[in-house]
C-alpha cells in the first residue's frame, strides 16, 4: 500500500478519532464523515483512499470503542503507523482489518505529506519522499491473514467456507 501521510502527535484518543456524539451508528461511511473531526475538522474531506496516518505514542487511547478504527477504515485509510498503540485499539484494528504498524523511528521521522509505501509481507516502510527505509516487527501469519481478509469476521467466514 502507498499513500500520503497525515501526521498526528502523542495520545490521540478514540475521542479524537471519532467523538462520542457520533456513536449512534457503526456504519463505516457515516463514521468516516466525522473521522478526526475534533483534531482536524476537514480531515475526512481531504484524506484520499490509501493515505496513511502517522502518530506518536499511545495512539487510540481512551475508550474501547471499535468505532474508532471503523471510522478510519471508512475513510479508506491504508494504514496507521505509530510509536505505540493503546492495546484495545491495536486489537480492534486487527479485528476490523485496519493495518497498524509500530515503528518508533518511522513515526518520529516521517513528515506530513510524505509519500510512503508499506510492504506488510516484507515488514518494510519506504519513504519515497526522503528515501529512507524502516523495518518493523512482522505480525504472525495468522494476524496478517486476518488483516488481509478485511477483519476477523471475514477471516472466520472464509475459513468456514461461507
Describe each region flagged by the PLM.
Residues 1-19, 154-162:
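N-terminal, positively charged, Ser/Thr/Ala/Gly-biased leader segments
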Residues 9, 56, 129:
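Pocket-edge structural micro-motifs
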Residues 12, 60-66, 147-157:
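Conserved phosphate/anionic-ligand binding catalytic regions in large, soluble enzymes, centered on
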Residues 16-122:
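Feature captures the catalytic cores and cofactor-binding loops of soluble hydro-lyases/lyases
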Residues 96-162:
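Acidic, glycine-rich flexible loop/linker segments
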